[in-house]
Amino acid sequence: MLKTQKDKKLENFFSSNNKTKKKKNIIVGLSGGVDSSLSAALLVERGWNVEGLTLWLIKGQGSCCSEGLVDAAGLCEDLGINHKIIDSREIFEREVIKKTTESYEKGFTPLPCSMCNKNVKFEEMLNYAVNKKDFTHIATGHYARIKKSSYAETLDCKSFKFKDFLLLRGADENKDQSYFLYSLSQEVLSRLEFPLGEMKKEETRKEALRLGLRTAQKPESQDLCLVEHYGSMQRFIDKHIEPKEGEIVHVNGKVLGTHNGIQHFTIGQRKGLGIAWPDPLYVKSLDRVKNIVYVADKSDLFNREAIITKVNWVSIEEPKQEIEVEAQIRYRSHPVKGTLIPLKNFDNPTTTFKLIFEESQSSVTPGQAAVFYKGEILLGGGLIS
């Protein structure tokens, strides 16, 4: 088969860049999108011996499934690197689909991406690298950064005891994905590379176009892979949870209507309530035991504190006393100042903390992550209880 101009361009570029560089072995997670594709290409350019790895998570279409598998395989062929597909459907079903379903049934609003990062993606990638023995590192296309602990010496962070590796926000604040990575361990950080961490999104697209990557003009995915597969989160919920009729009740006690399951609601929700009231009403809380959706005026949605459970300290040792943090309680929201207090009267005092906000926050949602920062350093995070 005759080589296209793009084939020759890639071949010449990477062969010339690898002649003088020492080879290191790395596994790159490939979804078939432009970010992971460019990550692989940049690592080849930098002299790594790269192998692409794609996890088959769900049957059917989606960036993590059929189309993504084809694009990832084609990219590896273009780059002249090996490509491996792992069937991870069973672990994804157990660790993400099942736990997401259980969380909705409890009246929480879960964070499937964080579940997947902790228990599927990085776990599967690291295990694969370890089993190959000669592969020392893994990489993904996340917009986040990793630094050695010495980096913190340049900052005013004397109140923290830092671990060997620090997780930082991505340089592009509009694309920063560190919020979803709060559950990573030091073992993972010590072997992890984020090739796009210092880049802006527009630079990513330009670089991919310059290199002639087949995914360079592929539209960016805006949804969870669950949403891409099922069409919407609503359809996912309908498929996995049986409807159960209950009441929609104003916090003053007045019954305003009925619903077909608390799994269809989230704290702060206004649309889709199907009730009549002179003023706009919002979901205030969900009572799983009584199967009641409580609604209230917007002013009633504010909370000054929250209990955070299952806290993982990524970049610092567990604090033994209260600390001042910048807390981010949902993706895309701005961090807010707060005080974090260890709770010693819980069964597991090392993972449960009280977060007191400097200013009251609206729609603090159980099941979402509260992630703690000091400037650009991600200290740790946990689940809002």
Curated annotation (Swiss-Prot):
Annotated positions binding ATP? 29-36, 55, 141
Question: EC number(s) of the enzyme?
Answer: 2.8.1.13
A cellular component annotation (GO) from this entry: cytoplasm
The annotated region (Interaction with tRNA) lies at 175-177, 330-331
Going by the record, the broad EC class of this enzyme is transferase
Q: Does the keyword Zinc apply?
A: no
Disulfide bond entries: 116-225
Site (Interaction with tRNA) at 142, 368
Q: Name one Pfam family in it.
A: tRNA_Me_trans_M
- Keywords for this entry? ATP-binding, Cytoplasm, Disulfide bond, Nucleotide-binding, RNA-binding, Transferase, tRNA processing, tRNA-binding
Q: Which GO terms describe its biological process?
A: tRNA wobble position uridine thiolation
Catalytic activity of the protein: S-sulfanyl-L-cysteinyl-[protein] + uridine(34) in tRNA + AH2 + ATP = 2-thiouridine(34) in tRNA + L-cysteinyl-[protein] + A + AMP + diphosphate + H(+)
Active site location? 116, 225
What is its biological role? Answer: Catalyzes the 2-thiolation of uridine at the wobble position (U34) of tRNA, leading to the formation of s(2)U34.
The UniProt family comment states: Belongs to the MnmA/TRMU family.
Question: Mind telling me what this protein is named?
Answer: tRNA-specific 2-thiouridylase MnmA
Q: Which organism is it from?
A: Prochlorococcus marinus (strain MIT 9301)
Q: What is the lineage of its organism?
A: Bacteria, Bacillati, Cyanobacteriota, Cyanophyceae, Synechococcales
